[in-house]
Structures are given as structure tokens and as C-alpha cells.
Amino acid sequence: MIHTLETTVAGRKMKVDFGKTGMLSNAAIFMSYGDTVVMINANASKEPREGIDFFPLSVDYEERLYSVGKIPGGFIKREGKPSDKSILHARSIDRPLRPLFPKGYRNDVQIVNTVLSVEQDNLPEILAINGSSLALCLSSIPFTTPVAAVSVGLVDGEFIINPTVAQRENTILDLTVCATKERVMMVEAGGQEIDEETMYSAIIFGFEECKNIVAFQEEAVAKFGKTKNEPVLYKADEEVEKEVKSFAFDMIKEAMYIMDKDERNAQLDKVKEKISEEFSEKYEDKGADIAEVIYKTQKEIVRNMLLNEDRRPDGRAFDEVRPISCEVGILPRTHGTGLFTRGLTQVMTVATLGALGDVQILDGIAEEESKRYMHHYNFPSYSVGEVRPLRGPGRREIGHGALAERALEPLIPSQEEFPYTIRLVSEVLSSNGSTSQASVCGSTLALLDAGVPIKRPAAGIAMGLITSEDLEKEKVITDIQGIEDFFGDMDFKVAGTEKGITSIQFDTKIKGLSNSCVKDALEGAKKARLHILGKIKECIPEPRKELSKYAPRTEIICIDPEKIRDVIGAGGKVINKIIADTNVKIEIKEDGKIFVTSNNEPEGVKKAISIIEGLTKEVVQGEIYLGKVTKTTNFGAFVEILPGKEGLVHISKLDFARVEKVEDVVSVGDEILVKVTDIDNQGRINLSRKDAIAKKEEEKDK
């Protein structure tokens, strides 16, 4: 039986159909918002997965190009692996949902979001978060707390829920808020240097709207929800937990209080060896339980240290940033480099400049077709002292790269100001917490070193949180290191300039953040960010005045758009010849702007521009030109005065004396000065060498 429920969000209809599709799924819904339609299917394995110490939740976000009436490019003509944007949207769905599953739940859970129809005014990724929550709540899977999501824009000082395309073009804020009816679960934001107070107000504004969508989900669950399965939750054997904890608690505590990370880990390894020696025979088949007890004991000790003893593992104050060092120009042949070190976290970012033709072409469901600025993030195993095969970028690398990219995007100059494609690559050399925000700092250094005229330097910081079991007591921590992230409750990343915030991403391991916690985190992040920006400015206060000698050079000229066809030529013949003759790259825009780029060949750029100017320049009557003789006849000489533009010098106009034979004065290939004496109504150009000489003599006498 098909059931339908409707509600209104931001003046537009949101509709859900149950029982219409996916009859064999645990839960399947067909959800629409305007003309945007997403199908969500949620399923779980019947039994827990053995031998794992994590919750195996899998979220997929599948974009179908037919949803926007497009056929995929390339030879295969079907969708391939998920795009970076699809991966980012899947991560945005995962983060607010994961903390709300029961602790110890080990059943495989898969949520598949398939985008079927897209109206650009209504973002499918926002609909997918709401639909994923609703599908889980309707299913028999033990998920009982609805989560809602909205997008928030800021146009002319007014907050807007789920802005349309026209509104998104004018917004200075792109914010996604996910929340239960009681607390904020997840925030993603990009902004044009938004102040902390405005950002906080925007988050709360979105939170209030989320409550209405949560109420809609609760209504649907009350009417159509399935009975929930009783979950089988993993828990360490009580006897094992009691004995191991009694034996090892003091030793683990002693190790956890060592401030130096390497020394602490070395001591923990010794403790684990002692535990193994003590219990390997008695509990030879309980290795997973023993590992769980060790983890829980470490977590208990660290959290108590932070929450009740006001002490951090490395001895810092709660609002203190780790020691920072900045370097630039460390690689000799690259266009710009920045090495940023904060404690044991170290990132090297390399900037590369290219022609505008080097932009990344996008083939997705969004209206955006290309990217001129991009940031890529690499996290090799050696950065954490581990050994594992090097693969391509995973979801984490793509997510962290996009986060740092978003932090700097509002600061990148326009292509008119800086006509280059910009690629940043952040190499994580050492990781002990918040490498994504270190990438923001490294990227700023690299851009400044490359001579990119960014509006202002940017920096990023990660804030953490420790809460009591009842969530009544909480402490916000500045610049969390690995151990605080691992055992803590929040990773709240904020990047921006001295003027305001350019990006936020936070998620939590608990059932949401209080409003006061959000505010405290924003304020703490600002203080830390300004401190880091001071260190960056000490290293390199402004962009270099000159580009690297190894960087390409680009010049811009503007022509009449009606003349573009003259530059391109039939089948691209003219432009391809210019490129071949001058060894440059040429990009032509519809408005008549032409970008000419060359790698280390400035003469090639000058030559190409000269040719283009000649092709597009109009012949002016009365002007004098230096032309080349292309043909002689018995009645005169034809002279090319601009590329593709010839005129006739009649034999009587060649010289002051009588000329019997044209070849007595000029030959094919000669360069001569000529004056345009007339352009008839058919466009034919009459020239005079005699008048040009006379005019030059007259100017010389003056």
C-alpha cells in the first residue's frame, strides 16, 4: 500500500511516498522537494559482523545524469565511479546519523540515495539527508532519533532557508545545518568572511527550521514506522573487563600521563605486552575483548583528565595552540611552497599555476561546469608512522581536500585580476590532529609564495569537546591533538581570515551540541586563528611581487566579440596556426577577452598578441602602415598592411618620379610604408607610398 505525507519547507512542498518503490528493502521512500526527487533505501544485515571494533555504516549517494537531462561524456556513456561531490554528499549524510545508532551496534547498515530528478532551486543533497533519517526511522533498524537538514543563505542581511539558484548567486553564506529536535548534530559552511556572531545566528536559524522537519518525520514514523529490532550490542566479557582493568588500570594511567607522544606510546606498548603475558593463556580467544578493555580504560583516563582535572595530555592550557613554525620557498623549481608545522602535525603545500585552459572540467548534475581553483590532499601512511599500501585518494582525502579548498575559495582573485588556473596539493608529512586545518595554513603560505594576490591570509584550527555522560558538563578545547580527537566528543574545524570565517565543518560523536557549546567553539577558534595568522604574517606578510621564473606568463587582450571568428578561422585554422607558430596557449571568452599563456617564452606571447591584434584591427583611412608587398602587376603593387588585409598601391602612387615598371621600385617581399588614401564602399583599400613618404618627411621637418 502506498502512503503519502506532505509538508511545506521554505514555501515549497516536501512530499514523501512510502511503499511506492523498493518493496524488498527494509525501508524505501520516494522523497521530493519541488521537482527534485531522491529515492532512499535503507537495509541492515541480520547478524552483527564478527571481528570488528567499529560500526560498519555505509552511505552511498548516487547521482544519475538523466536527473538533469544529460548523457554522460566520454566513450562509455554511463555513470562511472562516484564524483568527488557525490562522495562529499555521502559523508555529509553519514556524519549526523552515525552517532545516533546504539553504541556497540555491529550490524552492517547501508543507506543508498539515488538522485532521480533535479530542480536546481532545490538541492538533492539536503533532501537526501532528510530522507536517509526518515528511511532509518521507518525501518526496523534500531535508529530512533530523527535528524533534519536545511541549507541557509545570507542575502542582503537576511537569512534564507533553502535558497534558490538566484538567491545562491547573491548569498555570502552557504551553510548546511543538521539537527535533532534538541541539538545541532552537524554543520558545513562556506562563507565570505562571516563574523562569528552572524555565523552563530545563522546556525541557530537553521536549527529552528530543522525542528519543523523533525516533527514531520516523527508524524510519519508514528503512522507508518515498523517495529524496531532488538539490537545485539557488542560488549566486552564482564569477567575479562574486570580482571584486565584491575590488573592494568594504574599502568595505563601512568602511561597516559606522559606528555611526550612517542614516550607515551612506547610505554603503552610495554603495558600491552604485560597484559598479553598475564592473560594470553587464560583468555586466548578473548583478544578482541582485551583490546576493547584497554581502549575503554584509556578513554576513561583521558576524559577524566580533561573534564575533572583540568589537564591536557601534553600539559597545554585549554585555549593554547601548539608551537607553530612556517616556511616558504623550500622547493626550488615549483611555483610556490609552504611548510606549516603545528606541534607534531606538519603539512607541505605546493602551488602550481597554469593557463586558463587547465581548468578542471566537471561532468555532474550541478550547473557548475569547471573549476579554476582546486586543492588536493594526500595522507600517506608514513605521516602516522604506519605501513600500508599506497592507494588512490579515499573518501577522507577527498573530504579534507574539499574542506581546505572551501576555506580559501572566497579569497582567490578573479581571472581578470589573476588569469591563471591554480592547483594546490597538500602533502601531510606528519599527523597528530587537524591536518585539514594545517592544510589551510600551508595553502596560504604556498599562495603567498607563488605571488597569488589573495584578499587576505587564511588559517584554520580544530576545536574539541569533552562532555559528561549526562551532557550537563562540557569543556571546549583549542587545537586538539590526535589523542584528544580520538577520545573526545567533537571535531569542530573553523577556517578564516582576520575579518571572518570562510569555512566550518563540525561533527560530533555524541547526540549533538548545545547552543552554548557552538558559541564557545566559534569564539575560541577566532582567538586561535588570529594567533596563527600572526605567525603566518611573520613568515611572509604579503604575496610576492613577482611570479616564479618557472611559472607560466599570461597576458590579456580585449577584442570586439564580432572579431572572434577572425581569430579562430574556419575550422580553427587561424588560431591553431598562431598556437603552432608561437608555442602559446590561447583561451577566448565570449565577451572578447583573450588570454595568451606561455611557459617561459615571453616573446611567444608578444608575437601571438601582435598577430591577434593585426587580425582584429580595423584599417583606418589616413593612417600610415608598414606593409609587405605580396604581388606586383603592370598597374601597381598589392601590399598586406594587416594580417589578411591587402590594398593596392597604383603605379602612379609608388614614387614622386614617373615609374615605368613597378619592379623598378618594389619587389615581392619588400616592406614599405604606405598611407591609406581611400576605402571604397566594397571595402577595397587604396594605398599610396608617395603620400606616406611625404607625410613622414613633413613630420621630420617639424
From Swiss-Prot:
Residue ranges occupied by any S1 motif domain in the UniProt entry: 622-690
Protein name per its UniProtKB record: Polyribonucleotide nucleotidyltransferase
Domain KH, first and last residues per copy: 552-612
Alphabetical GO biological process terms: mRNA catabolic process; RNA processing
Enzyme class, UniProt record, top EC level: transferase
Function in brief: Involved in mRNA degradation. Catalyzes the phosphorolysis of single-stranded polyribonucleotides processively in the 3'- to 5'-direction.
Annotated organism of origin: Clostridium botulinum (strain Okra / Type B1)
Localization in the cell: Cytoplasm
Catalyzed reactions: RNA(n+1) + phosphate = RNA(n) + a ribonucleoside 5'-diphosphate
Family annotation (CDD domains): KH-I_PNPase, RNase_PH_PNPase_1, RNase_PH_PNPase_2, S1_PNPase
Cofactor: Mg(2+)
Binding site for Mg(2+): 485, 491
